[in-house]
């Protein structure tokens, strides 16, 4: 004898209702996983308990991608079948969709930081781990790319600064060479301008020299070492230079 059909209505007993929800929820999530694996279908399942707790299942644990695909599909359907967006029913439905998506995003945000992991089974934890590992791989790849780009920019700046330094060093050396040459020219000009021509002294006649050596004049006019006649004779015997003779004759 088979079981009778269970009448579908709200279970009044709170405990029985909670037990039935737990069993049916587990069976529903299991069926969603089975149809996803067996039929290679993308399945998204969202369940809220009476206390507002969220339970979900998504193929490859990517509920956001499924919701975006669903929204694109719904938007395309709405374009084909015009609806009255001003009606209260359409706004209520849109509000419910946005609220559901917001709750999914908030829950995933908690999962990504390691919160509320108690409700996940082994398969869901593995999928979450795979998502985090993939995200970490992309983050590291992007970080390495930015680091290589920064290093490349710094290397270009270093080469530019080195080139500027070489040019400045070359200009400094050229300037020092010019200053050294200018100092040498200034020193040479100073030596030329400060030098004087010394005229040779005219030698006295040998006879005049002998006369000056043999004759010593004193204050009283007397000639020392001989008489006046001898001094006069010595003076008469003095030979005059040619330039003086020409001067006297002229």
Swiss-Prot record:
Lipoprotein among keywords: no
Domain named MADS-box: residues: 3-57
Localisation per UniProt entry: Nucleus
Transcription among keywords: yes
InterPro entries named in the record: MADS-box/MEF2_TF, MEF2-like_N, TF_Kbox, TF_MADSbox, TF_MADSbox_sf
UniProt feature, compositional bias: Polar residues: 181-191, 226-240
Any one cellular-component term (Gene Ontology): nucleus
Name of the protein in question: Agamous-like MADS-box protein AGL8 homolog
Basic and acidic residues biased stretches: 171-180
Main function: Probable transcription factor.
Any single GO BP term: positive regulation of transcription by RNA polymerase II
Domain K-box span(s) in chain numbering: 88-178
Region entry Disordered, spans: 162-191, 206-241
Keywords, comma-separated and alphabetical: DNA-binding, Nucleus, Transcription, Transcription regulation
A GO molecular-function descriptor: protein dimerization activity
